[in-house]
Amino acid sequence: MKDLIITNKILNWYDINKRSLPWRNKVSQEKKQYFTLVSEFMLQQTQVATVIPYFNRFIKNIPNIEKLSKYNDRKLTKLWEGLGYYSRVRNLKKTAQIIVKKFNKKIPRDFYELKSLPGIGDYTASAISAIAFNKPIIPLDGNIERVLKRYLYLKKQSQIKKEFLQDQKKIFGTSTKRSSDYAQALMELGALICKPTNPNCNKCPLSNNCKAFKNKNFDLVKFKKINKETYYKLNVYKKNNQYLLIKNNKFNFLKNLNIFPMDQLNNPKNFDKDLNFKISNMNMNIKIEYKKNHNFDKNINWINPAKLENYVLPTFTKKIIKFLESQK
């Protein structure tokens, strides 16, 4: 009964306050499943506000799973340009190809079949199962984790481990008839009300029983992430006012994308950096060196900095080009 009360409170709040998001539009069941697949890939490590224009452009150009499975790689990367984490879009296309070939163009409903697809782990499989197929599953994303931590007042390191939170989320119960809405409602509650800072408790449907609200302590215990310090020498080759870029087969980040030739250095002494970037869990310190002659014989491109919009380039590379141009 208590679970049902919580569920109804959250669903009632959601019906009134939910955001209008393009992947929530009323469409056929087949389109809803495709929209969910695409949006969940895009939302991995990326905020909703950032994803919306990319999603709209993506769906306009690639309206179904079959077209995605055959879409030109260069055009696909261009559609994704600026979202980062490009392995997501490569995995999304691989997933589409498997769905077309193995599952007769139908996104699989089974959780473990979903998990077998490239780029889909526990969370994404849970989200697709709940949202696209109305299964009574609560996908534990950052928003729902935050609601759970505050509602139960979880303050110990042992209490914020994934395994513990997965067990504790049962406090929210499930909705048999509206599982899709309920999963999204919990996410929405974390995104709009139980925000990382300055939660809007006065509008929260759970505040009466929330232990963080009762204790007036909304601080969140987090695992400390340590960014790895890395050092690189970036080599600049210039000819006819164009920069030489190479296809990256050397580093795990920005795989198969165009970057400047770079060498990683191990704990260099007296390293005088020109630039600093953060990619994933790396703090990249970069020293720029201008070179005259190169010995690259393939996978190179000469880029005109005045026409950057014409190229498929990661933001990382674009920022370096703009920096170099600003130093003239």
Model-predicted segments: where are they?
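Catalytic cores of DNA base-excision repair glycosylases
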Residues: 4, 13-200, 206-209, 215
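Intrinsically disordered, low-complexity, charged terminal extensions of DNA damage-control enzymes
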Residues: 1-21, 25, 29, 188-328
